[in-house]
Amino acid sequence: MTDSTQTPDIPLLDAVQARLLGCLVEKEATTPDTYPLTVNAAQSAANQKTAREPVMNIDAGGVQHALRQLETLGLARQHFSSRADRYEHRLQAALDLTRQQTVLLAQLLLRGPQTLGELVTRSERLHRFADADEARHAIERLQQRALLVVLPRASGQREDRYMHLLCGEVDGAALAAKYASSGGGSEAADPGLAERVAQLEAAVAELQAQLAELRG
């Protein structure tokens, strides 16, 4: 992050654009050999059944349209090639973020509201935080820039949850209530085990994305 006092404008994304942007950040770290992503690989990443909330089913045309919109917003860049066009994210550069802030935003783009502990654990393949304080500091900086908000706690919740604001203002009370009514998601019983399973399933999804890449 630079020392410039001029704060970049914050773009307003729709749900598909947000999902694709999060995928580009994620795959830059987890599948560097096939990054930047083709439209097919980006579609596979966006429609993963694991490590995504909500699960989406975006067709190739919708993916390509969203990627082009991200490029117009300065959040992605297209690379032309003889075989297939590819896309890379520019989230960190466009919004003048640190690596830590970029990774945290990506997790929120991909999986919605999360606690500090969930963000630290789920970010390990993208950036290994030294401790919770490092992540907390990055969250505070994002909050100061109105890129992130702390959600009100619903009944029975013991930890704060955070949500990005790249899709505009959120109904914090409704999101908190939705999370509480779901029992905290599938991770509530054993978050460590659930996360390891999610990582294995994500690895399978990445292999599928690589196959899609080879097919064109």
From Swiss-Prot:
Pfam name, any one: DUF480
Superkingdom to which the source organism belongs: Bacteria
InterPro entries xrefs: DUF480, WH-like_DNA-bd_sf, WH_DNA-bd_sf
Entries under SUPFAM superfamilies matching the protein: Winged helix' DNA-binding domain (SSF46785)
Family, as annotated: Belongs to the UPF0502 family.
HAMAP family: UPF0502 (MF_01584)
Name the record gives this protein: UPF0502 protein Smal_0052
Organism of provenance: Stenotrophomonas maltophilia (strain R551-3)
